[in-house]
Amino acid sequence: MTLTRLRACATAGAALAALTLGSGQALAATPHAPHPRPYTVVDLGTLGGTISSGIALDAATVVGSSTLPGNTDFHAFAYDRATRTMTDLGTLGGTSSSTVAVQGRYVIGDSTTADGDEHAFVHDLRTHRMTDLGTFGGTGSHVNAISGDTVVGSARTTGNQGEHAFAYDVRTGLMTDLGSLAGPSGVSSAAGISQGRFITGTSDVSTAPDTTQHAFLYDLRTHRMTDLGANGGASSQATAISGNTVVGISRTGSAPAPDAVHGFAYDIRSRAWTDLGDHMIAHLQVSGHTAAGTDGHTAYTVDLSTGIRTPLGLGQGSTGVNGITGRVVVGETNPGPLAFAYRTDTRSSTLLPAPGGLYSTASSADEQGAVAGTAATTTDPDTVNSSYHAVLWTPRGH
């Protein structure tokens, strides 16, 4: 893990989305026409530099990263939506930090240490304390999600010989090695957690002659890791979890398309695997019974209870999906990028305004439909997008 990844995360909102093209059929499609819904936009500012990026939010807080004076380093920040103040969360002794998510009093992310390594952290907004989650004997760790009192991610093992998924309890400070489907020598990582109990991710599977990766489900109550398989294909990868549903991608590994990629949804209760086809192969997300993803050009949602697939209908360019919360899907459309918010209940799409310039990206939404992201803030004769700041979009009337 390197500082390069940290900085890429911090400036993701200001970069153009790189999308992999795909094609194919998946489920039934329902067309719709976009209907604009007004949003107000607030420039969240910076920590003294000229660049900031909004990554995630909840009802009280927006988190992201910002440059310091001189634009040499990025620090994680928390923006209080009530007081409209931005706080520098600092680092674990290194020069840079970035955020991944926020839930109530806890912000999770990654930071460099004094040794130049990268470690996962939890920052408590009440105590103003950043806790280093450490490793399993190696030099680095990375955090991906939080649910309830549990944080999940991956950490390097002794001698950096491997990397294992972990679960960290913010109450006890206990970090649990979830192992891998291939035993102690295998590699695994956790992508998400649901209900404070079910963790999903991807792990090596010991097969001859090669090592194959499969999606897994880990139950914190039974301490059991279950191989979700690949539905007859060659490999699978879990990307997200919500409620009792895991989503991800699988490779078919069969002729005539041995490397064909399909999206999937897995029901934890029934253990049923649903093939979402080759329209849902990138940035696959899930919230409740709705999955969202893209084929690399067009973004779609799928109602997992009916099987109906709906294109987001945002024009002729490519569309990327960055997140889904409740009934709101967010991402960006290109050329641009231009941030959008799409509501699954009304099937309406809205291009979100930038405070200045043109370009913007949307990273995540909260349950009320507010959106965090990054947007151009200045317009001048030489460049219409000379500065990018973290922003908060709020539906009017909320």
Placement of each model-derived feature along the sequence:
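Secretory targeting and sorting signals
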Residues: M1-T30
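Residue-level hotspots at or immediately adjacent to binding/recognition sites across diverse folds
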Residues: T2, L27-H398
